[in-house]
């Protein structure tokens, strides 16, 4: 099965203090008066991050996880962690991540060859270890369960976004600890002038100072809090 190479869309993630109050306030705000806002409905997805107990791959800037959407469609994802890029000499033209559709009952362990291929596309010299040996030591470490309500937001200048309000529950599979966070995820689907999206994100914070920008990705958030 062939890996699908994907480039990340620009986005901003924010911690919400009070989902019940802040979600309707944002959707009905003056900020969105010049936008057409359409409901995309609700969804539920579950991510399971696989790694060694000491997070060998995460420390190398590689996140390996499965994501299941609404209990049916499932993908294996090999993502390159942007928080680690500054400390690792990546190829400048690297993809953000690779994905592979898999069956609902499958995990990463059936796809060592595909994972190794994705790693070598970014690390032509490898990781100075036998990668398959480390993959065999991997097991579920972190689980992220996300209840999501999404809206498509479009204006006449070409800015097209998806705003998603999430209840994220993070769980440490081994330690059985868990915590939850309400968040807002804003993804830019298309824009004529990239500065327009940056300005929009700054305006969100200006108009809703109670929002806190999340600088870390989901795996780092989980590792720092569990």
Model-derived regions, located:
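Phosphate-end processing signature that detects enzymes handling 5′-triphosphorylated RNA
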Residues: 1-226
